[in-house]
Amino acid sequence: AASENVEVRFYDPVDLLRPWKLNYRLHDKYLIADGERYILGGRNTSDLFLGSYQEKRNIDRDVLVVSNGSENSSVRQLTAYFESVWSQPENRTIKGRASEKTGALHERYESLRENCPAAFADADWEEMTMPVARVSLLHNSPRAENKSPELWDTLCRLMEQGDDVLLQTPYLICNRAMYGDLAHLAGERQVRILTNAVETGANPSGCA
């Protein structure tokens, strides 16, 4: 947090005077580069997800979107969403001195450049991607408070327009109303849900 050009904020940090807010937390994972492309997926920022996989291999599915940054593009939508989260009044900016591990981080970076040169080579983004008609970002309110199910309602409206629905999520935890919505949708169309197996999922209660 004390490094040049780096600013870190905690979203809705713990406040013991408001214990009912302890479970209001972020679970978004995305990286935006130069306002033109982004990676969005389910990886946490730890060695298990982004490490060298020497002891255990962890496989996640990510989406790479390359955009021209036009006014209605999804990268603009994602950037606006980030700014709305970043500016929440409960957030706290982290201040402190540079870590003693900064040198080790630089050494790690140089090691990666030497051992994984392909990761640092220029990329042909057009060759690596496929054209799509539209990409839209859907999300709930960024406020750390009880929310109405806006995102679920939007997903249900989208699923109602299709004949064959594939829903992919790392784990699925529904309340009674959501199970009712899925049952209603499945009565008129094919609905398939792809999720982790209990043996491999990090949240067994939400896995198949």
List PLM regions with ranges.
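Charged, low-complexity intrinsically disordered terminal segments
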Residues: 1-28, 33-208
